[in-house]
Regions:
Chain A
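A beta-strand edge to alpha-helix "cap/lid" segment located at domain peripheries
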Residues: 2-29, 37-134
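Helix-to-beta-strand junctions that scaffold the AdoMet/dcAdoMet cofactor pocket
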Residues: 32
């Protein structure tokens, strides 16, 4: 039987599949419609509200037949009716790292928040560079 | 009577107060101890697990009597037993933007996840720079 964590990771896969295929309709269906939603795209400001969040996706996906994105090493964190998936993203040559927050709707998970920002390089940084800004 | 959202913003304030005063004991008390916890510090990799998350804070706060951080414009998003606070951070001269996920423990909120990454400059970018990486 498929478990909560598997379903959560499946929803996360579906989010990146919609992204990669620039499928705005699938993206709409994946975002929660009965919970507050928000997004922080890389280097961009906070976007709050379903209409505003979907408009941000339309702007990103508007003239693409597809999007060169893949995600790696997803980690699922279950917090009851909410679930978080943390993963790495590669968008073209950019390496990013993301927090995706999902809410459970019966047996499905729908996304309520996404933040993505720069990831460290795969190579180990030097000792004096290991300490992050915070 | 104080509401859920006010309590959630209060917990977010407490998180930044612990950070600013480099109070590792307060930080320990603020992080959830019965839920999975994780953190993504700016430009750093995913850290999972309470011991690992607290060790990351100890490394950041270890030789500081205080930390030059302030947060601004917090926005609370209630998802039932989970709450998200989105806010801007200023750390020294760095401008960051954060997702803080909290879990409700009776009447309190404890932090379960934090991601912080670069914020856009306050000035409006030029037209061709407005589109984020994604």
């Amino acid at each position: 039987m498929i478990g909560d964590e598997e379903r959560l990771l499946f929803a996360n896969d579906a989010f990146y599949a919609a992204f990669a295929s620039a499928d705005i309709r699938a993206m709409q269906d994946l975002w929660a419609d009965k919970h507050p939603v928000s997004v922080i795209h890389p280097g961009a400001d906070i976007v709050v509200g379903r209409a505003e969040v979907l408009a941000s996706w339309k702007a990103i996906l508007r003239d693409d037949t597809g999007f060169d994105i893949e995600h790696r090493n997803p980690v699922a964190r279950l917090l009851g009716e909410t679930g978080i998936v943390l993963c790495r993203e590669r968008v073209g040559t950019h390496h990013l790292i993301a927090t995706n927050v999902f809410v459970r709707i019966v047996d499905n998970w729908r996304i309520a928040h996404h933040q993505s920002g720069p990831a460290p390089l795969q190579a180990k940084p030097k000792q004096e560079e290991q300490r992050p800004v915070h």
